[in-house]
């Protein structure tokens, strides 16, 4: 636990990125149709979070396009988060998982038009399906709707603060 506010690092999480906090960090991000998945170990007091853009790698226009952002896609992000926590010695059954985002809205130029329909809901569904396939269930969720969210994730407590953005801001 940090002694004071100056001991806490602050990081902004971009789309497709993940952040593993082995030291006290406040991770912020802004979500529209994207989803953020956090995993926290109360025993280790360490957490990880990702900002995923699409349900699966198959959603992009050019599936042969190389992507170094493994967390850009929900399906690969869940695997990455679990592997990262496992490397820290965290067992799957001790994880607190949380899920956020999945609002309506997306720039259609970024994906095939048939994939863009309901992308927020599809991101949430993909997250829930991938987590369930790994035997995980979120302890907390704030998903869907038609407004974006600003999110703050505290890596040493697992706490998450959400601010819903006004429609005219999104």
UniProtKB/Swiss-Prot annotation:
InterPro entries named among the record's database cross-references: CheD-like_sf, Chemorcpt_Glu_NH3ase_CheD, Cytotoxic_necrot_fac-like_cat
UniProt keyword annotation of Hydrolase present: yes
Biological process according to GO: chemotaxis
Stored SUPFAM superfamilies: CNF1/YfiH-like putative cysteine hydrolases
A Pfam family of this chain: CheD
Keywords in alphabetical order: Chemotaxis, Hydrolase
Catalytic activity: L-glutaminyl-[protein] + H2O = L-glutamyl-[protein] + NH4(+)
Known function: Probably deamidates glutamine residues to glutamate on methyl-accepting chemotaxis receptors (MCPs), playing an important role in chemotaxis.
Name of protein: Probable chemoreceptor glutamine deamidase CheD
Taxonomic path: Bacteria, Pseudomonadati, Thermodesulfobacteriota, Desulfovibrionia, Desulfovibrionales
Gene: cheD
